[in-house]
Design a protein with these regions (language model features):
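Intrinsic disorder/low-complexity polar-acidic segments
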Residues: 140-365
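Feature for intrinsically disordered/low-complexity regulatory segments and propeptides
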Residues: 1-149, 171
Length: 365
């Protein structure tokens, strides 16, 4: 199994105002923010970029109101204008606005969905903000709704709690609950269940704990992803040690399917996992630990490929990875270990999801 640094990366970089100790606190913040937002459909020829404020950029529509660009919405607007956002950030705002307007004028006319927020006065004057520019087919699932769903599930399963971690930079200090992080681009949520100890088949006498990891973006930065897994522990630096994916749910923010299925899908995966007894889960892992998939690498690859677990390349790489880390690559547990390590090493979200799903299917092989 491999360490999961997803939450650690957020823990080490997020400011305090994007950190939340409970689902209740996160939900209150997100609901207030969602109430300030609205969606507007428009076409590219109706968008005009202007230099605004102190070397800032904004967009103006038919109403004449100015909406400030965020770092993320500038990326999206630059994409629509076929212009490099990183380069534009180094230009004076008047020149950057001219470049964007030219790019929009020569690009094929397209429809867009604008996600606007009326930001209240809070150290700065009240203003309108463009949080996202997406296609009309974008199906936004509000993080506040996702957190409300998790909150309801947690109330029926109170053993799921926020991990105890250090404050950022406070190594060795007192630990405090941290359920996750949320900013203007995405949100990360983590819960753990230490009340159910799962025997580790690779380390007799040791036990694994259950965890949930959920990621969502309202502005087109990420999919809606839910991972349920086992780990050795979650440490004070928010590293999920020796993690192993058991089940996963992942959907793109596009079309009607995610609107219909996200609520039920998250609940089904969560409840199925919560209702699985420690004895059943231990038996499942022990069986995977001893289950032989084949006498050698070609046979293992052939057995798993025929059942459409993964590609031959992925299975072969997982076999090598398991062997490299002193696991038996001819067993289901060894391949699970190899696939998990490959997932942690991949820079591509879609590939990580596919590898995690493959590992989950190997456990049920």
């Amino acid at each position: 199994m491999a360490n999961n640094y997803t939450m650690h990366q957020q823990w080490s970089t997020r400011p305090d105002d994007e950190r939340f100790s409970t689902l209740d606190a996160m939900l209150d913040h997100l609901k207030a923010e969602a109430d300030q937002c609205r969606t507007l459909d428009t076409d590219s020829d109706m968008i005009r970029v202007i230099s605004h404020g102190d070397n800032d950029l904004g967009v103006v529509g038919k109403s004449g109101n100015v909406a400030h660009l965020t770092h993320w919405s500038l990326n999206q607007l630059a994409g629509a204008a076929k212009s490099p956002a990183a380069y534009l950030r180094h230009l004076p705002s008047t020149l950057a606005a001219a470049c964007l307007n030219h790019g929009l004028s020569v690009a094929p006319r397209a429809s867009h969905q604008l996600y606007l927020r009326q930001c209240p006065a809070n150290g700065t004057p009240a203003h309108l903000e463009l949080r996202a520019l997406t296609s009309p087919g974008y199906s936004r699932i509000l993080t506040s709704n996702v957190v409300a769903r998790l909150q309801a599930l947690q109330s029926n399963n109170p053993e799921w709690q926020a991990p105890l971690v250090y404050r950022r930079g406070d190594f060795g200090g007192d630990r405090e609950p941290c359920v996750g992080f949320s900013g203007d681009r995405d949100a990360y949520i983590c819960l753990q269940n230490e009340g159910v100890g799962i025997a580790d088949p690779a380390a007799p006498g040791e036990h694994l704990t259950r965890f949930i990891l959920l990621v969502n973006s309202e502005v087109g930065a990420k999919r809606l992803d839910l991972t349920l897994g086992l780990c050795e522990r979650i440490c004070g630096n928010f590293i999920i040690w020796n993690s192993r994916t058991i089940a996963a749910f992942s959907m793109r923010h596009y079309g009607d399917k995610i609107r219909r299925e996200w609520h039920r899908g998250i609940g089904q995966v969560f409840n199925d996992y919560s209702n699985l007894s420690a004895r059943d889960e231990t038996a499942k892992l022990q069986a995977a630990h001893v289950r032989q998939l084949g006498p050698g690498k070609p046979e293992v690859i052939d057995a798993l490929f025929k059942r459409e677990i993964a590609t031959k390349q992925q299975i072969g790489d997982a076999y090598d990875m398991a062997e490299r880390h002193d696991r038996n690559p001819r067993t289901a547990w060894g391949i699970v270990h190899g696939l998990t390590r490959l997932s942690q090493m991949s820079p591509y979200a879609d590939e990580r999801i596919d590898l995690d799903r493959a590992a989950s299917r190997v456990l049920d092989f």
